[in-house]
């Protein structure tokens, strides 16, 4: 029998650092590298290990950010898709990585971030039309 799936949640802050968040950035980068090392060590046992890195996501943890509209909007504008993600969108990726369909995926870092990690930061993405 054997085998299995491990899906770890980190953050886009572990891929691209955020200002004034040194400890958080470091912790999330460590989680990503922990998962990559585990993927290598557990592959012989047919256990896959992958990381999901959410970007700005509407959750209980981010509720306070909505109380500061200029911060919330600044983060929204930094997302190329021009919106925050939902917990359901993150969960869908986790469900896939935990499924048999992902049996050949291991050591992957999967951003679920509306394109934040695709942006080098050199240019801000253009605003999408309001009806998008």
Kindly label every feature range from the protein language model:
Residues 40-41, 103:
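Alpha-helical segment proximal to the catalytic Tyr-Lys
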Residues 11:
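Residue(s) in the substrate-gating loop at a strand-loop-helix junction
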Residues 106-132:
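Short C-terminal tail/terminal secondary-structure segment
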Residues 51, 70-105, 112-114:
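C-terminal helical subdomain
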Residues 27, 35:
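Active-site helix of classical SDR
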Residues 16-22, 45, 82, 100:
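Active-site loop immediately N-terminal to the catalytic Tyr-X3-Lys motif
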Residues 15, 49, 53-64, 118:
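Short, flexible catalytic-loop segment of classical short-chain dehydrogenase/reductase
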Residues 42-44, 57, 85, 98:
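A short hydrophobic alpha-helix cap/turn motif
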């Amino acid at each position: 029998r054997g085998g299995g799936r491990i899906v770890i949640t980190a953050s886009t802050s572990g891929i691209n650092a955020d200002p004034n968040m040194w400890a958080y950035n470091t912790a999330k980068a460590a989680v990503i590298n922990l998962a990559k090392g585990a993927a290598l060590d557990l592959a012989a046992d047919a256990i896959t290990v992958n990381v999901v890195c959410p970007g700005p996501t509407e959750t209980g943890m981010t509720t306070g950010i909505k109380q500061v509209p200029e911060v919330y909007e600044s983060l929204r504008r930094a997302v190329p898709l021009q919106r925050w993600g939902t917990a359901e969108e993150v969960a869908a990726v986790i469900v896939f990585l935990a499924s048999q369909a992902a049996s050949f995926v291991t050591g992957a870092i999967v951003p679920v971030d509306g394109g934040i990690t695709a942006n080098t930061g050199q240019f801000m993405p253009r605003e999408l039309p309001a009806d998008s």
